[in-house]
Swiss-Prot record:
Belongs to the arginine deiminase family. It is found in: Cytoplasm. One of its GO terms (biological process) is arginine catabolic process to ornithine. Pfam families: ADI (PF02274). This is Arginine deiminase. The keyword Hydrolase applies. Its EC number is 3.5.3.6. Pathway: Amino-acid degradation; L-arginine degradation via ADI pathway; carbamoyl phosphate from L-arginine: step 1/2. The active site is at 476 (amidino-cysteine intermediate). Induction: No induction in fermentatively grown cells. Keywords: Arginine metabolism, Cytoplasm, Hydrolase, Plasmid. It comes from Halobacterium salinarum (strain ATCC 29341 / DSM 671 / R1). The gene is arcA. It catalyses: L-arginine + H2O = L-citrulline + NH4(+).
Length: 486
């Protein structure tokens, strides 16, 4: 079966992505703000590697936006989350549901008057200021002054003080890949694994509803946040090794690839194996990283993908566990999503941790074309590397371009495949320094020289340090609005 991209629908406004190497025409991003500050103060519960500078992170993000603005051909290629919400009248409902004013210390008449003024002011603020309040789940608390002193002609509000409380803010919202993903058929809303990220899907839903209009035709083909359970064995009896798990899916696990699609799903655990540090018992048959097999199969039954084949790629937990040379308990973060160890460059070239690719499998589902179900399991437990070679892909091993003795090697391996492909053999990767001996330089130079790949900007990639504290890199920070053949 060819890996060439199918014809896109005859609708130049449809939100869709046909293949990861097809030209990117428009992309959505979110400039991190005050909501991210809480993650800087307390990194671990917010899924960050460590603390970082918010100001420097914002500068990095703006530079990244400028790179894409210059690289993409459309007149308005960069869509910011706050602008889409504001322009499509989606912001007001979020302000009402996620921002509150506590004026309980004021008198009853004062409360009504002040609340009306404060709400009116909130709705007049810039969209990015508003989205920070929304994502921060902000409560503004007015503390009444008990001073008896009165100054004729002064505003009595000047004597009060204010507190602002951010209640479990959505610190990871600048990783715009995970709350949703875009297929050939349309938009899939995800169901996040971590509690701290689950409400992000509500913001994503509002943003797509707001975007739907003259410029873009948005079709939400599945909302997995509304699905509580799915029994795989009811549809695929031969997959009786799939446990009853939550229906979880995150966008970093998905790639469109022309006539086929890939979705990373839970790891397959051999019978009798146990990993106590990861809460994997001997009777467990799968280990959930971020996306469950059940969610992948449910999306097949919902016909959400649109491609002729769909491969459910098992997370390479055992291979990653064996390869890890330190016991830091973070193996699941190293292979958190498919895009943390695999990516497409063109219709015949991928970059990957080759050892992981060669030591995991996928289940290949084929479209039935009028059958009782949209897809049926055609080939179970296919070696992932063999499948890619069948499709005509050469696998570039990241270890060919990373010096294992470099002090930043571990950091590089977490980000090296998380580049953004903006067109055939044209990528935007991350780098960590301007030095000639930087850990990413060998990869950036080598991929250009050995495989005729264009690296933007300026053949060097984008220097990102602070934004990387949240694990993800450039692929994680973007979601395509439209990616189709020229």
């Amino acid at each position: 079966m060819s890996s060439e991209s199918p014809e896109s629908v005859d609708d130049s406004t449809k939100v869709q992505a046909t293949a990861e190497w097809d030209p990117l025409q428009a992309v959505r991003m979110h400039l991190p703000g005050a909501e991210t500050f809480v993650g800087i103060m307390d990194p671990e519960p917010n899924l960050f590697l460590n603390d970082f500078s918010l100001v420097d992170a914002q500068q990095e993000h703006l530079s990244l936006s400028q790179d894409l603005e210059a690289a993409l051909p459309a007149s308005n290629p960069i869509h910011y989350l706050h602008d889409d919400l504001a322009n499509g009248n989606g912001m007001n409902a979020l302000l009402s549901s996620r921002v509150n004013f506590d004026l309980s210390e004021l008198g009853e008449d004062e409360q009504v008057n002040r609340r009306d003024k404060m709400w009116a002011r909130l709705h007049e603020l810039s969209p990015h200021t508003q989205i920070q309040a929304v994502l921060g789940n902000a409560e503004v608390i007015r503390h009444h002054s008990h001073s008896d002193e009165e100054v004729p002609g002064s505003n009595p509000d000047r004597w009060d003080t204010t507190s602002v409380q951010l209640e479990q803010p959505l610190t990871n919202m600048y990783f715009q890949r995970d709350q949703q993903f875009v297929t050939q058929n349309g938009v899939v809303l995800c169901s996040m694994k971590e509690d701290t990220r689950k409400p992000e899907v509500d913001i994503a839903r509002a943003s797509w509803e707001a975007l739907d209009g003259d410029e873009f035709d948005v079709d939400i083909v599945a909302d997995m946040s509304q699905v509580r359970e799915h029994d795989v064995t009811e549809h695929v009896p031969e997959r009786d090794d799939i446990q009853e798990t939550e229906v979880l899916v995150e966008g970093g696990d998905f790639y469109p690839a022309g006539e086929f699609s890939l979705l990373g799903v839970s790891a397959k655990i051999p019978e009798g194996e146990a990993y106590p540090k990861h809460d994997i018992a001997e009777d467990d048959t799968e280990y959930v990283h971020r996306t469950t097999y059940a969610a992948g199969h449910r999306l097949l039954m919902d016909d959400a993908f649109g491609s002729e084949e769909v491969g459910l790629v098992r997370a390479p937990f055992e291979a990653a566990q064996a390869h890890k040379d330190d016991d830091n308990g973070e193996v699941e973060m190293d292979i958190m999503h498919l895009d943390t160890w695999f990516n497409f460059v063109d219709d015949d070239l991928v970059v990957a941790h080759k050892e992981l690719v060669e030591n995991t499998t996928l289940d290949v589902y084929a479209r039935t074309h009028g059958g009782e179900k949209p897809y049926t399991l055609e080939r179970p437990d296919v070696n992932f590397g063999e499948y890619l070679r069948e499709k005509g892909f050469e696998i570039v091993d990241v270890y060919d371009y990373v010096d294992p003795s470099h002090p930043d090697t571990d950091m590089a391996l977490k980000a090296i495949t998380n580049f953004l492909t903006v067109g055939p053999r044209k990528i935007l990767p991350v780098r960590f320094s301007d030095d000639d001996d930087g850990v990413m330089k060998q990869f950036i130079d080598g991929i250009q020289e050995d495989y005729d790949v264009t690296v933007i900007p300026d053949g060097e990639g984008r220097k990102i340090i602070n934004l990387r504290a949240g694990y993800g890199a450039i692929h994680c920070m973007t979601t395509p609005l439209r990616r189709t053949p020229e």
